[in-house]
From Swiss-Prot:
It comes from the Bacteria. Belongs to the SfsA family. This is Sugar fermentation stimulation protein homolog. Coiled coil: none annotated. GO terms for molecular function: DNA binding.
Length: 243
């Protein structure tokens, strides 16, 4: 995913009312939209460098969007929750159906022939992606989760209690019982982690459900994102699990 123009760099001053951030930029204070409902627990540190995008849409109330904050370890941390789905969608469309060309972390996606985004499984629920083979009525369902939290070199999810995330795990287990396969892609929007674990201290029920689903065959894929001021890409680096 390429940004429309190179991100601007400033100093993160504060986040408030969840969706607003003040940034020092070229000697002035500007306000940016924060596209993240989580706590941003490990990067909500005033004084850190940050990167933000600028919209050319004249109807937007805030023309700036906070995209990344530099962590105390020196890693850029992506905070835009829309980024992971875009990056995974681009990767899937590049990989699916190209069986002979794909190796490594994405190889299991190449076995499928079609990508169906925002796949409706009930009146109330859509999952991020469904992958389909031409000769099968069974699907591979994918739900994408954004990861910003890290503690002692371990990426963790969630950074706040997520009843929606719990619901998705129950639904994925139900789909697996019907003979489908399922996967959660945890997109690690930082480079300073060597493993992934559920954040049991924040949402113990999510951790319990994730382990149950994993034991029942859920594929858990913590992919690291490559973050730069020009683009964000899904790397083939899959972190080891600490379950």
């Amino acid at each position: 995913m390429k940004f429309h123009s190179k991100l601007q760099e400033g100093i993160f001053l504060k986040r408030y009312k969840r969706f607003f951030a003040d940034i020092e930029f070229q000697g002035q204070q500007v306000t940016a939209h924060v596209p993240n409902t989580g706590s941003l627990k490990s990067v909500n540190n005033p004084g850190q460098h940050c990167l933000f995008s600028e919209s050319t849409n004249p109807e937007r109330k805030l023309k700036y969007t906070l995209e990344m904050i530099k962590s105390p370890t020196g890693s850029w941390v992506g905070v835009n929750t829309a980024t992971p789905n875009t990056v995974v969608r681009e990767t899937l469309h590049h990989v699916v159906g190209h069986k002979k060309e794909v190796i490594g972390g994405f190889a299991h996606w190449a076995a499928f022939d079609e990508v169906k985004p925002e796949y409706k499984i009930s009146a109330e629920t859509r999952l991020d992606f469904a992958l389909k083979k031409n000769n099968s009525d069974k699907m591979h369902f994918i739900e994408v989760k954004n990861v910003t939290l890290a503690e002692e070199g371990t990426a963790k999810f969630p950074d706040a209690v997520t009843e929606r995330g719990q619901k998705h795990l129950r639904e994925l287990m139900a789909l697996m019982e019907q003979g489908h396969t399922a996967e959660i892609v945890f997109t690690i929007q930082r480079h300073d982690c060597g493993s992934f674990s559920p954040a049991d201290d924040i949402d113990p029920e999510y951790g319990r459900l994730l382990r149950e689903a994993y034991q029942k065959g859920l594929r858990v894929s913590p992919f690291v994102l490559d973050l730069t001021p020009e683009s964000v890409e899904l790397s083939e680096t899959v972190l080891p699990l600490k379950m």
